[in-house]
């Protein structure tokens, strides 16, 4: 099977690209994945409860509901959505070749590929994590920190770098107190961020401390069991939120070694757009965004990728017509 455009990934960036390409009558194919990276089709937002910062929803919207709306809109404008995971992708020449997990014997081709597979937060994998994920445990303070379950409550952040510092400072807007759990006896954060943390009246840093277990009432988390790695003392910290700030992993395994990536595995794009060092291969959303990682910025990135793909195909079609005339 040959397609003009294939989109790999089904988060806001993938579906926004599909909407634009569908409206351009390019009949895009979107592979939404089958539990790719352990996440259901729709990406990270399917694990989020209330989304309060996506424009157009003054009362907020459930993450799965938002992604279902994205999916319906993609289909409405002509995108073909396939629930399968692309397992191999050859970018050595165009048209690009790929195959899926359901049948790795059969290869398909595409003139243009948009990779929108996102990134996933690193987890601690402690007892209670699965029970209280999005019920007290989160990997995004900016996304979830203002939620009612966290407002006016003591909260904890895990990490020691700039991301942990930023998340802790952000949470002070809503929390009565923020505990920062740092595994070592010093911060990895930049000096200016460390200074802000150390002098903030709402923030207490617990040095040499790791989280062992999250506890609660089987509905919401209300406590974290912690351990001092130097003294071996184990205690319970009464907090209603535990935020992970220990980094993200971009889902770029499919193309590593083929396309230019940075040291952390994020795809390098040109001039803030979706173009990569390979003509016809575009990256959108969190696979190339290690800074913002928001649903709305991801959607905007997908828009750029869709428009760039449409423009490239139109230019190539025009050149072909000139050569044939």
From Swiss-Prot:
The first-level EC class reads: oxidoreductase
Enzyme Commission designation: 1.8.1.9
A GO cellular component annotation here is: cytoplasm
Which co-factor is required? FAD
Q: Which domain of life is it from?
A: Eukaryota
Q: What are its GO biological-process terms?
A: removal of superoxide radicals
Q: Name one GO molecular function term.
A: thioredoxin-disulfide reductase (NADPH) activity
Ordered alphabetically, the record's keywords are: Cytoplasm, Disulfide bond, FAD, Flavoprotein, NADP, Oxidoreductase, Redox-active center
Q: Which InterPro entries match?
A: FAD/NAD-bd_sf, FAD/NAD-binding_dom, Ferredoxin-NADP_redctase_2, Pyr_nucl-diS_OxRdtase_2_AS, Thioredox_Rdtase
Q: Does the keyword Cytoplasm apply?
A: yes
Q: Which cysteines are joined by disulfide bonds?
A: 140-143
Q: Where does it live in the cell? A: Cytoplasm
Its UniProt entry gives the catalysed reaction(s) as: [thioredoxin]-dithiol + NADP(+) = [thioredoxin]-disulfide + NADPH + H(+)
Residues given in the record as FAD binding sites = 10-13, 39-40, 44, 53, 86, 143, 286, 293-295
- Recite the UniProt cofactor note for this protein: Binds 1 FAD per subunit.
What family name appears in the similarity comment? Belongs to the class-II pyridine nucleotide-disulfide oxidoreductase family.
Assembly, in brief, is:
Homodimer.
Q: What else is known?
A: The active site is a redox-active disulfide bond.
UniProt name for this protein: Thioredoxin reductase
Question: Which species?
Answer: Pneumocystis carinii
Its taxonomic placement starts with: Eukaryota, Fungi, Dikarya, Ascomycota, Taphrinomycotina
The gene it comes from is: TRR1
């Amino acid at each position: 099977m040959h397609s003009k455009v294939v989109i790999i990934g089904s988060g806001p960036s993938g579906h926004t690209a599909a909407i634009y390409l569908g409206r351009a009558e390019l009949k895009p194919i979107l592979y939404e994945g089958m539990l790719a990276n352990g996440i259901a089709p729709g990406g990270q937002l399917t694990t989020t409860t209330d989304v309060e910062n996506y424009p157009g929803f003054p009362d907020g919207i459930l993450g799965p509901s938002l992604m279902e709306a994205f999916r319906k809109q993609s289909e409405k404008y002509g995108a073909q959505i396939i629930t399968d995971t692309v397992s191999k992708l050859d970018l050595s020449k165009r048209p690009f070749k790929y195959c899926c997990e359901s049948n790795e014997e059969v290869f398909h081709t595409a003139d243009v590929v948009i990779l929108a597979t996102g990134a996933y937060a690193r987890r601690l994998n402690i007892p209670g994590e699965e029970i209280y994920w999005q019920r007290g445990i989160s990997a995004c303070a900016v996304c979830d920190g203002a939620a009612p379950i966290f407002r006016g409550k003591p909260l904890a952040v895990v990490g020691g770098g700039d991301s942990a510092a930023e998340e802790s400072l952000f949470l002070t807007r809503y929390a009565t107190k923020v505990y920062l759990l740092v595994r070592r006896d010093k911060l990895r954060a930049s000096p200016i961020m460390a200074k802000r943390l150390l002098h903030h009246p709402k923030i207490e840093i617990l040095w040499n401390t790791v989280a062992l277990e999250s506890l609660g009432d089987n509905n919401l988390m209300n406590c974290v069991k912690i351990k001092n790695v130097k003294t071996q003392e184990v205690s319970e910290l009464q907090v209603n939120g535990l935020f992970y700030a220990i980094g993200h992993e971009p889902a770029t395994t499919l193309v590593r070694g083929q396309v230019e990536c940075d040291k952390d595995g994020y795809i390098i794009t040109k001039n803030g757009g979706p173009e990569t060092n390979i003509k016809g291969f575009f990256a959108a959303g969190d696979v190339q965004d290690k800074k913002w990682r928001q649903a709305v910025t991801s959607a905007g990135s997908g828009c750029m990728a869709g428009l760039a793909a449409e423009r490239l195909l139109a230019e190539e079609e025009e050149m072909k017509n000139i050569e044939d005339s």
